[in-house]
Curated annotation (Swiss-Prot):
Substrate binds at residues 71-73, 90-91. This is NADPH-dependent 7-cyano-7-deazaguanine reductase. Its main location: cytoplasm. SUPFAM superfamilies: Tetrahydrobiopterin biosynthesis enzymes-like (SSF55620). GO terms for biological process: queuosine biosynthetic process; tRNA modification. Pathway: tRNA modification; tRNA-queuosine biosynthesis. PANTHER family: NADPH-DEPENDENT 7-CYANO-7-DEAZAGUANINE REDUCTASE. Belongs to the GTP cyclohydrolase I family. QueF type 1 subfamily. It catalyses: 7-aminomethyl-7-carbaguanine + 2 NADP(+) = 7-cyano-7-deazaguanine + 2 NADPH + 3 H(+). The active site is at 49 (thioimide intermediate), 56 (proton donor). Keywords: Cytoplasm, NADP, Oxidoreductase, Queuosine biosynthesis. The gene is queF.
């Protein structure tokens, strides 16, 4: 295997204390000449309410069309874990995750759906994307139904 210049893959690594301390890594995309979509799903994303300190939970769906770089998935897992003790509003967490991926991987296109579970009786869904999807890119539905209580 070639040297991928990563610091976490294949090693025992402690969970980062915060998103600022986390290291999100990239690896070369061997299919950089092909337009395709890659999807990461994090069904148990957690963060803290910045006011009450209570836990918040979300189902994140991250779709991106890689360019020259791929997001290394272990580093993404650790980056997402770093939010566990981080106080931030739902909207901020969702967009922060997406913008960090864009900064590191420089994809052709990215969108994120943050499907937050209710607190105070209100579910919050947050959506962000870098712009229109490239022509010819197959973009499937994110597959997360709107929240429905017992009603």
């Amino acid at each position: 295997m070639t040297d991928l210049n990563v610091t976490q893959l294949g090693r025992v690594v402690d969970a980062p204390e915060s998103p600022e301390a986390a290291v999100l890594e990239r690896v070369p995309n061997p299919q950089s000449d092909v337009l395709y979509l890659a999807r990461f799903v994090a069904p148990e994303f957690t963060s803290l309410c910045p006011v009450t300190g209570q836990p918040d939970f979300a189902h994140l769906v991250i779709d991106y069309a890689p360019g020259d770089w791929l997001i290394e998935s272990k580093s993404l897992k650790l980056y997402l874990t770093s939010f566990r003790n981080h106080g931030s509003f739902h909207e901020d967490c969702t967009v922060k995750v997406a913008r960090k991926i864009v900064e590191i991987a420089q994809p052709r296109w990215l969108r994120i759906g943050g499907y937050w579970y209710p607190r105070g009786g209100i579910p919050i869904d947050v959506f962000w994307q870098t712009g229109p999807a490239p022509e010819g890119l197959w973009v499937p539905d994110q597959g997360v139904a709107p929240y429905r209580g017992r009603g």
